[in-house]
Amino acid sequence: MNFFQRFTFLFSAPVFDADDLEGLRLQQIMAAIEHMGFQVVKARRIEDAEIAVQTDAAIGCMVVDWGKKGLEGKAASLIALMRRRGLEMPIVLLVRRKRFEDIPVEVLDFIDGYIFLAEETPEFIAKNLVSRLKQYAETLKTPFFGALSDFAEEGNQLWTCPGHNGGIFYSRSPIGRIFMEHLGEAVFRDDLDNSVLELGDLLTHEGPALQAQKEAATIFGAEKTYFVLNGTSASNKIVLSALVAEGDLVLFDRNNHKAAHHGALLLGGGTPVYLPTERNSYGLIGPITPASLDEATIRAAIAASPLVKDPEAATRRRPFRVAVIEQCTYDGTIYNAQKLLEKIGPLCDYILFDEAWAGFMKFHPIYAERFAMGLRELGPDAPGIIATQSTHKQLASFSQASQIHVRDRHIKGQRRRVEHRRFNESFLQHASTSPFYPLFASLDVGAQMMKGRSGEVLWDDTIRLGIELRKKLRAVRREFDEKESDPVRRWFFDPFVPDRVSIPDVAREGGTHDVPWESLSTDQLASKATYWEFKPGAAWHGFANLAPGLAITDPNKLTLLTPGLDRTTGQYEAHGIPAPVVAQYLRENRVVPEKNDLNSLLFLLTPGVESSKAGTLVSALVAFKRLHDDNALLDDVMPEFVARRPARYRGVRLRNLCGEMHAFYRSANISELQKAQFRAEHLPEPAMTPYQASRYLVRNDVDYLPIDEIDGRIATTLFVVYPPGIATIVPGERITERAKPMIAYLKAFERAENLFPGFGAEIQGLYREVDASGVIRFHTYVVRE
């Protein structure tokens, strides 16, 4: 099947039968199209055609029967729907000569051609339609994927890497053949060596590879875009390796992903000045504490840092080489980037916005002023702006696909600017000389999918689906509250959005009144960021220190809170349902959340999520509630899990396990520890820079100790609970009384590993060792002193 034959024809007409002349002519046209190797889809009703155009993106040409007055307006509405959704395939009207005058001007604007059944032969009409489809399909060929597809169709015989030679090597082995059939032949044929000159150079950015990145830059609002093939972890390292040299000051959001630590501090050798951040009682990741963004506070932090040796650093006009900001956290806290620019921009040469979790913000107006490439008023005194995005997270790309967007022409000619040639030297340090071409092609295609009206429609649909899903969850919860006679059963999972919001009061000029969030129309909720805002003092979000308009919760992150904490006070309740238990149940029922914390579950919303999947999620959550309330045996609730750990869980009941685990975390006061370890007063004392501490680890000048024995010692690894991948202790920090919440938090996880096997978290920088008595103990490396 060639490139063009991957597209189909849609015929929308009430008559396809060959027992009348019109039906016979249609059959002959469709048969001629099929004879040329194309598939034809038939829709007798306009409603069926509407479903087809919204669900089948392979339609390359549509033929619509105009009928009597446009089938009472239905044909016109179908055509308008297609164009409104940004669908640009050719539309050809099947029309009778006497009804041609019925077609209104607004429809004529959308039409590419006409078929009069009484004229021309079926074979000629079919050729004309195929020609139109090919012209349309040609416009969809993206720079790199188009060239890759053309090369694949040439049938070139390759004597190059990779050794599997288009998959043939795999076909010589039974399991290799199965592997090849599982993935499909095309991915092996497209796995090419960089000696294929027709595709350009992915490292020096030439040919189709360069053109793909140029067009992506235009689509995402950047001046220059780099495609990166080993994740945003690598993108951040590329950017920060290009910007930061040993001793440079880095203004560092304590919410940053571990890759930012690697790039700026462990590889670059930068000296951090940290911005403390908020957590709520559920452990959700909140914004930077507003007071810490004040210039005077930041300059005071520079002056107070024992790592800053330059006595004049705090008074320099631009003390920081770069500020690194987690623009969208894993839990969906998104900043107003314009406000951050106004606050910290004058202090920095560059700002790196890590948008790994929100590469879609360019494509919906609700995110206005919240993404780096949309920043306004960038003059010669502004910092250079860089954004990194994990296109594989919620955009359409293969895993590990990432991109770097740059806007820094406004500082051209200034010494602080890193021009392309120097930046690319850093790119080359972190890029493989054997890139995976299908991965690069996925970045090219993923960008083009967002082009024009199409991207806006896709993300608007997604946000609306998320709103409707949250409304349904609130409705289910309300029903349980109203209908359950037993108070113990009056609960359900609650979406992390406001309980009530303020709207204008039509009865009082300038007045407002509060209404339930879910009572607002989907149009309102999908268009105004104020209904997603973390407003200071609002109980629903639980963040103590906020500034007006600083942050919102992301409509495309569906966070569900589990019972166990009073949402108003943040205090533990008598009984709770830990999220790890819910997540395990869902996985065994083939519903896989993105992540869970102790009291929350995260589900990602993308254009790949459909209503049926949303309905399945609601049903699974209701089923879990029934099993919990009936205190069902774990053997029945999660049999696969119990079968792996029968000694601990066989015969245990679901509600009892939830209560036991909840009581454990309540006794350890985990909720308070999660908040405390990111507060300014608990950020550990820095004894040396992260880079210096990491050298001790490399040279093996370290002691390997259980965490019970590291008081007063200097860390050499990042202590990272994963997810979300945020460091609680950084190399070079001395573990003293200030770090008590971090150590207490990790010790609680250590005890939980032994009490609740199978529900443990991934913790990087610490290592599980089993002592002589069979107890798991966490160990780590500290500087040998």
PLM feature spans:
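Conserved acidic segment of CheY-like receiver
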Residues: 2-33, 42, 62, 92, ...
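Short acidic, S/G/P-rich loop/turn micro-motifs used as interaction or catalytic elements
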Residues: 15-22, 47, 65-74, 97-100, ...
